[in-house]
Amino acid sequence: MSKIHVWVPDLFSTTGGIQTFSRHFLEALGKEVSPEGIRVLLKNDPPDAVHCDDGFRDVNAYGHWPTPLRTPRFASECLHRAWRERPRLIVSTHLNFGPVAQIVRDFTGVPYVLIAHGIDAWRLNSRSRQKALQKADLALAVSRYTRDWLVHKNGLDSQRVDVLPNTFSPDRFAIGPRSPRLLQKYGLTAQTPVILTVCRLAGAERYKGYDQMIRALPQILSEVPNTRYLLVGTGPDRSRIERLGAGLGVQDAVVFAGFVPDEELSEHYNLCDLSAMPSKAEGFGIVYLEALACGKPVLAGNKDGSRDALNDGELGLLVDPDDTTEIASEIIHVLRRQHPHPNLFHPEVLRQRVTELFGFETFKRNVADRLRPFLSVLVLSLAGVLT
């Protein structure tokens, strides 16, 4: 019985947008095809970190290999298993594995689908990866912004690129009161105006706009004193951010939460009056969906995939990410609860609408729709085996 092979960077050893997407993608695919019809190959997860409770049994992990050997080992295993098993389809949730998929297709005819997220697409500095992307049977982009980048910057045929928006787990996020424990931990009160950003603090992540938030704070504080900017996330850029805040005289208004485990994210979203990440190169932005599921107003940049996450402004505020005056002005109106946006201060409306647009049931239907030309053959094959 031919299966679908899904190649994934990792699912368990790190957290991030691609990991979250990959988990949801596998869950959706497993409900469409059944886990027995899928083989998963994980590059960076060690075998002892793998814990699949969704019926997946054919999972191969290579994260225990030394870093210098891991990439060639993973590539050789992908090639070997594809050659031996002749899958119906190969899906790679990262563009880096595209050249290997192209080799398989060239020698066996097995079709492949590549999924592009954001920074992986606009930092595609390898000719072999670009060629593999161009030759893919289908490229899926998580937003219109990423899709347009693939078409205009990487020369893809627009007929072979489609959009598969991100999703989230609504049951992990809920509208709730401010946690007294977290208020005490961060030196806040129930009345403190709080702006929240959730992201990794690293040089490569500055496009997410936390610098712009720091630069907007003097104007915000002049109108809404005692405001606190809560940064959730860790990374090597923290010391530079601290210096930036000190240079602007707003260091006391910036609160670093550090690493927060997934199970505590909902509580942190519920601390804030506004979740803000005015990015300018975000592929999509799952954090926007999470904040909206907690009923929180959201501010994002208007030049990237954030537009998709906020449904072109229906779900939140879209600002010029390079204009700190506009950023500050919009935030001030939200903190004063004077913004005219019709949905910002209606938590249940925000939660209901983001779930309708991006909840898992919608995502599952989207996966089935995008992969229908490939899945129909596999479903018929599985039906023949099971009868």
Question: Model-derived features: where do they sit?
Answer:
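Carbohydrate-associated surface elements
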Residues: Y145, T167
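Short His-centered aromatic/hydrophobic patch
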Residues: S92-G98
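Nucleotide-activated donor-binding/catalytic signature segment of Leloir-type glycosyltransferases, i.e.
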Residues: S239-V260
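Aromatic "clamp/platform" in nucleotide-sugar-dependent glycosyltransferases that forms part
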Residues: K280
